[in-house]
């Protein structure tokens, strides 16, 4: 078995990187519903996002000079990123956290492929008792869940990597109304997504993180700003 020609023929740096480093037998299970419906644009977007965030993670790992770490992926969905990290960093412990994983999904992936990936079925709002992690990652965090990812990172981790998705929260609207500097900055930006990301960076700073922002134009999505932070 190999990747479909619609993916193999796509000449893109991140897609080629992904294919070289991730076996199709695992990929075909994780992405089975999308492959069956031939949702190739969606699949390519997901692959590119995984590589974009993986590159940030890899740089942070290189700075720490160790490949032995604990990583939580919050709201992991199909957990493609978690599996990619588990495959490429076999000394790591990777935990995918989401509301529900099917028994078939868990048994197929845990027993057949990697022994360093684990699953927790829990609402992110109910997470109160995790062991400390080195990294917390979330891709596609929607609305106020992006704030909650930062809160959980502040509580349980030294680093976080976040790719926000849907925009807005009550705190964001209040912050825009009451923050004079933000209003001046926002008047110069005609992109609500970037405004939202700027707010989230400021929110993370208030939780004692040193923040970096990276726009990754190689990710096949308009929601391509990666926020990553280290606890001060």
For the regions a language model picked out, list residue spans one by one.
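Class I S-adenosyl-L-methionine
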Residues: 1-232
């Amino acid at each position: 078995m190999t990747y479909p020609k619609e993916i193999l023929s796509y000449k893109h740096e991140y897609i080629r990187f992904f294919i070289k480093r991730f076996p199709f037998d695992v990929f075909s299970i994780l992405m089975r519903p999308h492959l069956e419906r031939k949702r190739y644009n969606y699949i390519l977007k997901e692959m590119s996002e995984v590589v974009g965030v993986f590159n940030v993670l890899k740089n942070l790992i290189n700075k720490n000079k160790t490949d032995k770490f604990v990583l939580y992926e919050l709201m992991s969905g199909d957990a493609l990123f978690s599996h990619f990290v588990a495959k490429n960093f076999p000394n790591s412990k990777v935990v995918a956290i989401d509301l529900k994983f099917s028994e078939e999904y868990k048994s197929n992936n845990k027993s057949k492929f990697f022994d360093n990936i684990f699953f927790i079925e829990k609402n992110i709002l109910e997470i109160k008792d995790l062991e400390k992690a080195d990294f917390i990652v979330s891709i596609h965090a929607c609305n106020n869940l992006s704030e909650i990812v930062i809160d959980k990172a502040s509580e349980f981790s030294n680093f976080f990597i976040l790719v926000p998705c849907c925009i807005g929260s009550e705190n964001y609207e209040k912050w825009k109304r009451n923050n004079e500097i933000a209003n001046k900055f926002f008047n110069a930006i005609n992109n609500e997504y970037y405004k939202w990301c700027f707010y989230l960076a400021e929110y993370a700073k208030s939780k004692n993180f040193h923040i970096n922002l990276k726009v990754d134009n190689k990710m096949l999505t308009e929601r391509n700003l990666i926020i990553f932070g280290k606890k001060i």
